[in-house]
Amino acid sequence: MLRLLLVRHGETLANQLGFWIGQGESEMTPEGLKSIDWLKEQLRSETFDGVFTSPSQRAVWTSLQLCVPHLISKEEIQQIEALREIDFGRFEGKNFKWVKAHEPDEIEKMLRERSKYVYPEGESLCTQHQRVARWLHEFIQKYEKGNFLICAHGGTIRCILSELLIGNETLHWRFKIDPASLTIVTLTEGYAVIETLNYKQNQV
């Protein structure tokens, strides 16, 4: 059995303020730091056969913290370009309200084209999904069993879940993936089961 522990990085300032931060960087909030400490304790008893992360600083930092109890060094953590968040292009650091006020035509396009909408100078959800899916299938081919930690972004994790369940991006927005949350998926002979979804601190 292959078991994937999918962790979204801790809350960043951009998350808190509602800005789109895809492939750019944003520092962690105090709450984000605390929630990763909590998650580290939840995962202390796990054994990792490998650790993979997006190269974004927020994801790398999250993976490093979670690996401390397991004595896994930074050099042992594999940074994977395909696990990066969507590229918002020139809308990086902006939000829906800003785009609606300054480039309303783009909002109309966004709502009309949905997953095929390409952010100006960036990429579409379709493109992000395809790059994540390519890596995912290579990963599954290479590792038929084991327990793996994957630290990434909300969008990346939704791509993984949608691909595993139906083989495309259609279910992307059906999953809520909060900062510092844990989602666990098991695969047996290619059949994926979501065992835990969006598990986080102070969950009601």
Please give the residue ranges for each predicted region.
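Short active-site segment of divalent metal-dependent hydrolases/proteases
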Residues: 12, 156-157
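Phosphate-handling substructures
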Residues: 69-131, 186
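Surface-exposed helix-capping loop/turn segments at secondary-structure junctions
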Residues: 46-49, 140-148
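Acidic, low-complexity terminal tails and accessory targeting/binding regions
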Residues: 2, 68, 86-98, 141-146, ...
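Active-site-proximal alpha-helix that buttresses catalytic centers in soluble enzyme cores
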Residues: 11-72
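Short basic (Lys/Arg) and small-residue
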Residues: 153
